[in-house]
Amino acid sequence: MKKYQRMHLIFIRQYIKQIMEYKVDFVVGVLGVFLTQGLNLLFLNVIFQHIPSLEGWSFQEIAFIYGFSLIPKGLDHLFFDNLWALGQRLVRKGEFDKYLTRPINPLFHILVETFQIDALGELLVGGILLGTTVTSIAWTLPKFLLFLVCIPFATLIYTSLKIATASIAFWTKQSGAMIYIFYMFNDFAKYPISIYNSFLRWLISFIVPFAFTAYYPASYFLQDKDVIFNIGGLILISLAFFVISLKLWDRGLDSYESAGS
């Protein structure tokens, strides 16, 4: 474990050195993400100027859900975004072969090879929103500790879904479109799922479970709703999807044939 931690830090340092050679691109990337999320919030604020609540949720509560959703999304984007490359080009162009010739677990290598620093924009917006809305929560020590526990498990859902959909490329040569389709469901997690129809609520809860990355844990923190389902469900589903994604990765790796073979 320590060996992999050291290697991860080495990859991060090397990638940051590369990024710092193009400082303008870095600043533009972070600002772009920051402005995108800011415009979404501005639109939401405009809506709440005309209505007092949305399905019983106040603007402050929805802002907390929105901010909460950006933290695991931003962490996954920051550390594990290279899975997009697997789905889009590594298998199709035969570039995946190099990962099989090195004395490193290929999945670990792909996960830590890049460091998407523009994700800091998402983390910054998420942090600001959480910082300005936490006063609406009656915090206790157990609740605060559960909040800290939720973040890595919510991040694991993002990463697991990307591992699973990226692994499809081992059979189809590319799966970028599939990753994109599944990943876009995360937008629904930024708002209370009670505003959606029953089918969509079921879909984003148990098939593409992004609702567990924000809405369900936020329901516990904001309204003290069912800790077993909202927090326990997050932990159980994230671990289940991680195991499934690893199984799919292993099956795909066994079926892999180089694009040049």
Regions found by a protein language model. Name each.
Residues 1-261:
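Hydrophobic transmembrane alpha-helices and immediately adjacent juxtamembrane helices
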